[in-house]
Amino acid sequence: ESLYYEQSHNGSTPQYGGNISAIDWSVADESDTYGKRGYTFSYDGMSRLTATGYLENGKRNNHFSTSYKYDLMGNILSLRREGLLNSGNYGTIDDLTYSYKGNQVVKIDDAAEESPSYKGAMHFRDYADEETEYTYDANGNMLTDSNKGITSIDYNVLDLPQCISTKSRALFKEDSNDTIYYTYSADGTKLRSTYK
């Protein structure tokens, strides 16, 4: 694995402020056809990541590329991520649009039409289509997340979550809830997690 900063690598723009301009690594499979894989990284004038370009053997192919857009406050407005789809083709697995009230996200929509093919894929699942999918308390702590089935989060005096209640993972059945309890020391170190 190699990281590149001030050097241009596979068409990346050199970065002189500490950002990574590119990464590559070696991969082999049964036919040894993949050789090297990597990413190039692009940033805006505020040093925010705006795009990752996926490469195989030094050639861009967008199979696992990502792009980001931001508002003037630095909040993510959109995120588009490519990957391997259930159909066996490569395409968009996330096409997210974020809506805010102040600087707090209240809704995320996903326009992607197909899910990734691999189990455990880290992509957004748009389980809710509500006007307000995320709520917060007066301190800015998240209270609910409709897309993840989080129905309530209780916080301690340090603003650390002490109880998270969720709908069942099995299609968020209303009659089945899971709860996670957290115990902390006086300085905020998490001591225990209990699942019920």
How would you label these PLM feature ranges?
Residues 1-196:
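Acidic/glycine-rich beta-solenoid
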